[in-house]
Amino acid sequence: MIRHVKTIALLILASGLLAPLAQAQDMDVIQRMKDREEIEHLMWRYTRALDTFDPDAYVAVYTEDGAFGQVKGHDALYKMIADLRASREQRAAEGNPPPEMFHATENYWTEFVTKDHARHHAYWVTYYGANGPDAPARMIQVGRSVDDLVRVNGQWLIQSRNVAPQD
């Protein structure tokens, strides 16, 4: 009888000691799920900013020293998107409006390097929208990306974006 009481007491003690550990693990899982959702939203904002040629929204998803390939830093990233927008507006003014552009990201996976550093892997497709009711949308480019993301002041941002990794 005493042996059973000791066993029961040890089980109760162990469950009391393990409960905080289980709660901590649950909190880690919840945080990781929240991080994944925030990263998914970050990448949606990136795509939307690119497809609407919005330089302010585009630089807002990058760290101050963020890079898209060889284009590095907010000023250079802003100029890249502003120049694309100006070129499109110029073509439209000349009577040759370019079709709308759409990017789709598929089969993405987020790898957590540390709690504040993630690597986002994805396949992407670029489409040109129809220029008029009789013109079909066209797939113009496909590829794969590997992006390094970091948490800065509680917010996930793109540190570097590589849309043509060599591996």
Walk through the language-model features, giving the residues of each.
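A solvent-exposed, acidic/Ser-Thr-rich amphipathic alpha-helical stretch
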Residues: 55-125
